[in-house]
């Protein structure tokens, strides 16, 4: 009965359909578990919930666990050894933030190592994540930086869509006729990275999804644009004021995301 109660209070399969309260570290981990489908952490999360009665310490440990997982996601670290790794945390009775930090610091195997700042920073403009991973990263950054006094309420994870600001089919309507073949390939790679992705509150109409920046931003008489569906998104809305969206802006936004 005790374990069943801990499970009910800790593991929340509907977390992606529920409001994420500021500072609710358990719900943030549940977003990673169910929104980004990293279920291998469940046994360890339950172990900590059972063995660590100090809520403050529990939250600090879970916050560091989130940092660890997010860094590995951003850098596209493998998950193949996660089962063994999280079992080893249980076996070594790791139930405090300091113990978790120290244990991770001693792991040098690339399959479980904590990525350093330089690798994380470079990955924001170098790595193409899956849509569910990119959405999860942006959502958790968005939820972390929002003020409780924000004029718009954070939606549930499932209520957001992910949008490539510069579309994959940029050749149709975006400036690029003067790009060399190599520059065009580099653009193709860059537009898949986090700096070119944003959360929006509703998927864009297919009629403007591949439109140029001005039309995609402002919308048309028949279809709303990013100014409607990305307004209020802390990680993006300021860029709606930009006259251009190009490689330089994508890299600038990536640096801003890293800073969060």
Residue positions per predicted region:
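C-terminal, well-folded lobe of enzymatic/effector domains
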Residues: 56-63, 67-80, 108-116, 216-260
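Betabetaalpha-Me/HNH-type nuclease active-site subdomain
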Residues: 94-237
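Noncatalytic linker/hinge segments flanking ATPase motor cores
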Residues: 85-91, 203-207, 243-248
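Generic hydrophobic alpha-helical scaffold/packing signal
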Residues: 46, 62, 66, 163-166, ...
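A cross-family structural signal marking well-folded subdomains
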Residues: 1-137
């Amino acid at each position: 009965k005790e374990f069943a109660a801990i499970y009910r209070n800790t593991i929340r399969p509907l977390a992606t359909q529920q409001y994420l309260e500021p500072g609710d570290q358990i719900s943030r981990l549940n977003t990673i578990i169910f929104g980004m489908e990293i279920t291998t952490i469940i046994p360890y999360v339950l172990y900590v919930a059972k063995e660590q009665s100090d809520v403050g310490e529990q939250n600090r440990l879970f916050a560091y666990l989130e940092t660890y997982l997010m860094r590995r996601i951003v850098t596209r670290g493998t998950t193949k050894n996660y089962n063994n790794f999280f079992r080893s945390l249980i076996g070594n009775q790791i139930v405090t933030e300091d113990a978790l930090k120290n244990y991770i610091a001693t792991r040098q195997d690339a399959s479980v190592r904590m990525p350093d700042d330089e690798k994380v920073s470079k990955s924001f403009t170098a790595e193409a994540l899956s849509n569910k991973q990119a959405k999860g990263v942006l959502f958790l950054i968005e939820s972390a930086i929002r003020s409780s006094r924000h004029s718009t309420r954070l939606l549930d994870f499932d209520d957001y869509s992910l949008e490539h600001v510069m579309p994959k089919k940029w050749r149709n309507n975006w400036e690029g006729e003067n790009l060399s073949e190599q520059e065009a390939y580099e653009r193709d790679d860059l537009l898949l990275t986090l700096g070119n992705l944003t959360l929006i509150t509703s998927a864009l109409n297919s009629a403007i999804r591949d439109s140029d920046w001005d039309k995609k931003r402002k919308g048309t008489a028949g279809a709303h644009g990013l100014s409607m569906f990305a307004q209020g998104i802390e990680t993006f809305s300021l860029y709606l004021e930009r006259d251009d969206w190009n490689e330089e802006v994508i890299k600038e936004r990536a640096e801003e995301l890293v800073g969060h």
